[in-house]
């Protein structure tokens, strides 16, 4: 807010003069309706936006070209304040068309393909529209917009201010903004490359009545609002020639406005007719002569003012020519610099390309050497793997042979063990059968002996009982006789015989057992010898 105060203080006088001139013209023409001023003091400084708050209601093709242009991304990015953007407009803007001259190829295309609505092929977007979108990014206030449309240095600053209003403000407020400037006669060339000079008033009338602006479109105005604007414009016809006092007053106002905008002043001093008339009336006593003199002075004043206007126009033309020459020179310098830079860049690129090619060749050589070494290593590895596989095969064959021999040995041993087990089983069966037969014979013998002994014992007991019964008195004698009998040699002989028989029987049994054992040992000793012989014979055959 504080940065914009100097620009507004110097422009307050032209604003009030323009508003007063419009009111006087309406009263003289008979327009009874009172119009609203462009900006009232009661309104706030915050300026509301209408439509899309991100794209500023611009055509998408133009917006994408603005955002992708290096001028907007690099140079305008450094501008941060309102005054810096205004200075950039003063030095860079030469037309108000959206595209630069010759950048869009639309020859032979008609309708929508011709780019009438901005949907054709894009081109180089103009600096004017880049700066217009930069103003939109700054979010201008009401006072800043008024400073743009009443600026005194360049008509292109005013034109961009009016375009900002046309794109961002509601359609119902456009008449309030543009009404006091519809008769503004400041000239500007709006076409790229020149050839389309119009005044500020004519440009504003086209803004209000037409949607097309060269190869783009303004935001659409609703039908009732458009009808209202058309009716109000019909009541305000554009005045081409002005006669009498009204023309003089308009010329005076226009000259005052020019003087307030330009620092230079005209050579003829401004004098009011009342003061000249009063002075001449006091000097000369005759009123007719004073009136004639006053008329002559007024004619001279008008002539001088016309000459001053012509001089101002010539100065403007010379200034515009000088500006054009300066711009062309600066552009030619920039082109020369850009060409020299491009040449330097091309040389640097060539050197870089050569270095890159050399590095690539070195890398290729390294890769080739590495591939060769790698191939040699692979061949060595293959030979080693082949040798290892041969060794492993030979080892595997030897191990397989050993394994087969071990298996055969195990089979022979198992066969021998099985044969031994079978032989031992058969021998054990024979032994068991023999032992059973022997035990049976021994049992029979023992049974027969026990029967004999029992029968003998019974007989003896019977005899003893008979003897005891017979000789009860002769007990002692009988006992003595019995003792004698028992200790008689026949009795002892019989006992000795029985004992000798038992001993002989035991000896026979022991001898039989020893013979069986010896036979078993002989068979066991013979079997391993036979097995060893068989194994040797098999080994010899293998």
Swiss-Prot record:
Q: For the modification N-acetylalanine, which residues carry it?
A: 2
> Which intervals carry biased composition (Basic residues)?
256-284, 328-344, 419-448
Q: Where is the composition biased (Polar residues)?
A: 1-12
User: Which InterPro entries does the UniProt entry name for this protein?
Assistant: PRP38
Q: Which residues carry this modification: Phosphoserine?
A: 5, 288, 290, 318, 320, 446, 471, 473, 479, 523, 525, 530
Give the record's GO biological process terms.
Answer: mRNA processing; RNA splicing
Offer a single GO CC term for the protein.
precatalytic spliceosome
Q: Where is this region: Disordered?
A: 1-24, 232-542
Which superkingdom heads the taxonomic lineage of this protein's source? Eukaryota
Primary localization: nucleus
Q: Where are stretches of biased composition, namely Basic and acidic residues?
A: 243-255, 291-327, 345-418, 449-466, 479-492, 499-522, 530-542
What keywords tag this UniProt record? Acetylation, Coiled coil, mRNA processing, mRNA splicing, Nucleus, Phosphoprotein, Spliceosome
Q: Where is the composition biased (Low complexity)?
A: 13-24
Q: Which residues form a coiled coil?
A: 292-323
In the record, N6-acetyllysine modifications are located at: 227
Tell where it localizes.
Answer: Nucleus
The task this protein performs is described as: May be required for pre-mRNA splicing.
PANTHER family documented for this protein: PRE-MRNA-SPLICING FACTOR 38A-RELATED
The family classification in the record reads: Belongs to the PRP38 family.
Protein name, please? Pre-mRNA-splicing factor 38B
Record gene name: Prpf38b
């Amino acid at each position: 807010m504080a940065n914009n105060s100097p620009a507004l203080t110097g422009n307050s006088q032209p604003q009030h003069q323009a508003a007063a001139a419009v009111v006087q013209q309406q009263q003289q023409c008979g327009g009874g309706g009172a119009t609203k001023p462009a900006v009232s003091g009661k309104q706030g400084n915050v300026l509301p936006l209408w439509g899309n708050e991100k794209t500023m209601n611009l055509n998408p093709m133009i917006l994408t070209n603005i955002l992708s242009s290096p001028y907007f991304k690099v140079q305008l990015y450094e501008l941060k304040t309102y005054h810096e953007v205004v200075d950039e407009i003063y030095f860079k803007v030469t037309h108000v068309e959206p595209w630069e001259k010759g950048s869009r190829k639309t020859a032979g295309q008609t309708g929508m393909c011709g780019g009438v609505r901005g949907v054709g092929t894009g081109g180089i977007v103009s600096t004017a529209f880049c700066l217009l979108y930069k103003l939109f990014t700054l979010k201008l206030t009401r006072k800043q917009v008024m400073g743009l449309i009443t600026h005194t240095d360049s008509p292109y600053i005013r034109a961009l201010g009016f375009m900002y209003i046309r794109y961002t403000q509601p359609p119902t407020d456009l008449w309030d903004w543009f009404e006091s400037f519809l008769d503004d006669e400041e000239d500007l060339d709006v076409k790229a490359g020149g050839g389309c000079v119009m005044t500020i008033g004519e440009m504003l009338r086209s803004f209000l009545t037409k949607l097309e602006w060269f190869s783009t479109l303004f935001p659409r105005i609703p039908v009732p609002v458009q009808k209202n604007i058309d009716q109000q414009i019909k009541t305000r016809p554009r005045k081409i020639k002005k006669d009498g006092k009204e023309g003089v007053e308009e010329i005076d106002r226009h000259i005052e406005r020019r003087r307030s905008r330009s620092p230079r002043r005209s050579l003829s001093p401004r004098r009011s007719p009342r003061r000249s008339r009063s002075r001449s009336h006091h000097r000369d006593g005759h009123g007719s002569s004073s009136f004639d003199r006053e008329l002559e002075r007024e004619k001279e004043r008008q002539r001088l003012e016309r000459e001053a206007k012509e001089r101002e126009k010539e100065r403007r033309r010379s200034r515009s020519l000088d500006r054009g020459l300066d711009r062309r020179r600066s552009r030619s310098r920039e082109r020369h610099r850009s060409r020299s830079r491009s040449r330097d860049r091309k040389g640097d690129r060539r050197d870089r390309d050569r270095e890159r090619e050399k590095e690539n060749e070195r890398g290729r050589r390294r890769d080739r050497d590495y591939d060769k070494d790698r191939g040699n290593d692979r061949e060595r590895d293959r030979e080693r793997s082949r040798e290892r596989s041969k060794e492993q095969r030979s080892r595997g064959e030897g191990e397989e042979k050993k394994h087969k021999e071990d298996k055969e040995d195990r089979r022979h041993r198992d066969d021998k063990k099985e044969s031994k087990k079978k032989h031992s089983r058969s021998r054990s069966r024979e032994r068991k059968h023999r032992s059973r037969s022997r035990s049976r014979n021994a049992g029979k013998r023992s049974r027969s002996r026990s029967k004999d002994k029992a029968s003998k014992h019974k007989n003896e007991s019977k005899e003893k009982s008979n003897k005891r019964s017979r000789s009860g008195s002769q007990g002692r004698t009988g006992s003595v006789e019995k003792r004698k009998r028992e200790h008689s040699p026949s009795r002892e002989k019989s006992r000795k015989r029985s004992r000798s028989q038992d001993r002989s029987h035991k000896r026979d049994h022991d001898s039989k057992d020893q013979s069986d054992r010896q036979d078993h040992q002989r068979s066991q000793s013979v079997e391993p010898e036979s097995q060893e012989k068989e194994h040797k014979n098999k080994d010899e055959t293998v």
